[in-house]
């Protein structure tokens, strides 16, 4: 669990997301409250439930990114789902319990990886021993007393020499023949609506049939070391312990991001055709958000302390169009701001993995030095903002389209410009995008 203070969390989020201070503050406090709850003694700890968050704002302003980065900071099981994918029980589509099943699968994978990291050093040593046994088979004991001891000393010295060469990568390209565990054969089964759990159990049953069998394979030592390390680490894990920790991790630290929640609201001016199913999804979500117990193949999972972050643009609907019970389960409401030209400018250049840095790194692989002048970045931001205003406002995602169109020619002919420097200034941007951005009909289709 993260022990970062709210200010530290916001500072980390600032490295990747521009603006949206209110939303960052809300999620930072929610994450810190989880740590605070763990410091409270029982039985009061069980009574403290997370305060779920409703983010309201247009597309492309950072709602999903805030939740995703938060989960990464907390090292918590995180699942993003779209509310429109779910239907009321009895209708065709996924039922809401599958959210928890997806979350527990992610948690098991995370927990297994964390446990394997703990035993990685020991597993690597054992994997090296297995490779050395193939490269240097133990000599048969011949003779008596001193001769056998002398042979063992020589063999140990040779093993140490080979182990050193193995660790330095000098033997990476040499091939060895090994008995490796055969991966269980995957089996795809089409799941009827609402039968995902039964399908998962059948798939698990069939996958276990082939497990444990050994297969003789010829592989390079570099790959063999990785495969054997994973195999040895897996042997050291206690599967029941992994499952228990994974369930506990979901119950205490799980984060569910419910996107497009505004699309399942009831609107008074519509016919009653789709209303039943929409309200049904809200009513099915209600016990999950309130706190219930869901049966999964890893055991019963309580959702009382899972943090739910819902988001929606709410262009046509209002948060008050949600059923009252569900509204009450999202006490923290945060409105995200639309992005300005200055925000676009910062997104292009100021974040840790900005678009400018990404494209510079990509073209550097072909020895093309890409430089963005300040006026070029400003003009790019202005064009992206203008196209959003004229056509559909898709927020920061517009920058991907604009910069891709801008660098289309450079990317295509990068091989012919090795060792050259390409400077993107306002004049270059205007030449590449000016005509398209001015023509509204053209920008509607191209940008």
From Swiss-Prot:
Query: Its family?
Result: Belongs to the ClpX chaperone family. HslU subfamily.
Q: Tell me the compartments it is located in.
A: Cytoplasm
Gene3D superfamilies tied to this protein = 1.10.8.60, P-loop containing nucleotide triphosphate hydrolases
The UniProt record lists the keyword Transmembrane:
no
Q: Does the keyword Plastid apply?
A: no
Q: A GO biological process this protein is involved in?
A: proteolysis involved in protein catabolic process
Q: Where this protein primarily resides, as one coarse class?
A: cytoplasm
Subunit-structure text: A double ring-shaped homohexamer of HslV is capped on each side by a ring-shaped HslU homohexamer. The assembly of the HslU/HslV complex is dependent on binding of ATP.
Q: Which InterPro entries match?
A: AAA+_ATPase, ATP-dep_Clp_protease_ClpX, ATPase_AAA_core, Clp_ATPase_C, HslU, P-loop_NTPase
Sorted alphabetically, the keyword list is: ATP-binding, Chaperone, Cytoplasm, Nucleotide-binding, Stress response
Protein residues bound to ATP? 18, 60-65, 259, 325, 397
Give an example GO molecular function: ATP hydrolysis activity
The scientific name of the source species is: Burkholderia ambifaria (strain ATCC BAA-244 / DSM 16087 / CCUG 44356 / LMG 19182 / AMMD)
What stretch or stretches form a coiled coil here? none
SMART domains linked to this entry = AAA, ClpB_D2-small
Q: What does this protein do?
A: ATPase subunit of a proteasome-like degradation complex; this subunit has chaperone activity. The binding of ATP and its subsequent hydrolysis by HslU are essential for unfolding of protein substrates subsequently hydrolyzed by HslV. HslU recognizes the N-terminal part of its protein substrates and unfolds these before they are guided to HslV for hydrolysis.
Q: At the top level of its lineage, which domain of life is listed?
A: Bacteria
Name of the protein this chain belongs to: ATP-dependent protease ATPase subunit HslU
Q: Which GO terms describe its cellular component?
A: HslUV protease complex
